[in-house]
């Protein structure tokens, strides 16, 4: 006969096994660059010229144009690097974009304003997102997609964001 303690322990282990980790592994070709097409709402992961994966996404609440100032709701345009990964993001997982660059800082300073910062590709705190543009300038994908992107993309990867 199985003791109550063994039954409870076994049930707990089965429950843990049923939970999937948000940390995935990836053993395919290296992602050498990311392309983001704001108007088409498509994020592409590439190995040299080969498309590995493409994802739809949501943007900031004012998506047209290049991010110029903190709080403008825009996503930057241009070339940047992935400069950090955040496994503790309040948006599931996130990878940081090296905005602002020197040109962004100079432009904002010329207008006496802050360029802002903390631009990320991230998941969503609400898995039932309504798919409207809702971020403050970040690029938002589903949590499942973010798990794939997080596993595939390394710090130092080039990201180019197009209008």
Tell where the protein language model's regions lie, with residue ranges.
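N-terminal secretory signal peptides and thylakoid transit peptides that target proteins
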Residues: 1-14
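C-terminal motif of bacterial Sec signal peptides marking the signal peptidase cleavage site
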Residues: 17-18
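Post-signal peptide N-terminal segment of mature Sec-exported envelope proteins
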Residues: 26-49
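Short Gly/aromatic-enriched secondary-structure transition segments
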Residues: 50-62
């Amino acid at each position: 006969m199985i003791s109550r303690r063994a039954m409870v322990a076994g049930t707990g282990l089965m429950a843990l096994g049923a939970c999937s980790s948000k940390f995935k592994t990836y053993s395919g070709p290296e992602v050498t660059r990311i392309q983001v097409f704001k108007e088409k709402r498509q994020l592409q992961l590439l190995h040299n010229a080969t498309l590995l994966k493409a994802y739809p996404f949501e943007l900031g609440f004012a998506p047209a144009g290049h991010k110029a100032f903190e709080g403008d709701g825009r996503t930057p345009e241009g070339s940047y690097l992935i400069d950090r990964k955040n496994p503790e993001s309040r948006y599931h997982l996130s990878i940081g974009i090296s905005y602002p660059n020197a040109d962004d800082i100079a432009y904002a300073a010329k207008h006496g304003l802050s360029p802002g910062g903390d631009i990320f590709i991230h998941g969503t705190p609400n898995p039932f997102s309504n798919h409207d543009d809702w971020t403050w300038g970040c690029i938002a994908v589903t949590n499942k997609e973010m798990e794939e992107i997080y596993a595939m993309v390394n710090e130092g990867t080039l990201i180019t964001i197009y209008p």
